[in-house]
Regions:
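Thiol-based oxidoreductase modules, predominantly thioredoxin-like and allied folds used
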Residues: 10, 33-47
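Residue-level recognition of oxygen-bearing side chains
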Residues: 20, 45, 78-81
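Active-site loop signature of alpha/beta-hydrolase-fold enzymes
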Residues: 45, 58, 70
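Structural micro-motif
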Residues: 53-62
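Non-catalytic, surface beta->alpha helical segment in thiol-disulfide oxidoreductase systems
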Residues: 63-96
Length: 96
């Protein structure tokens, strides 16, 4: 059984770039059958997972395969750049 790849988006409540990025990321990730997308709002309730992944700014996107980080993107990226980055990192994750 093949493990799925995870994309985790960390965002903040008052982060305009996070809200702009969210629909773009959801649209891009939906084209991959073997990728799960999770959204985590950085708050007091999520501090344990924020510390685990050493998130120091939002938005941050992580790509994990078997719980091992294979990609990290900090800050807002235009859709075209994000699509290229996701393709590259997801392809790398599939090879692991």
């Amino acid at each position: 059984m093949e493990k799925r790849i995870k994309v985790i988006e960390f965002s903040g409540e008052s982060c305009a770039n996070c809200y702009s990025l969210m629909p773009i990321l959801y649209s891009l990730v939906s084209s991959y059958d073997d990728v799960d997308l999770k959204h985590i709002e950085v708050s007091e309730e999520s501090m344990e997972v924020v510390a685990k992944y050493e998130i120091d700014r939002v938005p941050t996107i992580l790509i994990l395969k078997d719980e091992v980080e294979v990609g990290r993107c900090r800050g807002y990226q235009p859709e075209e750049i994000l699509a290229i980055w996701l393709d590259s990192k997801i392809e790398d994750a599939r090879k692991k």
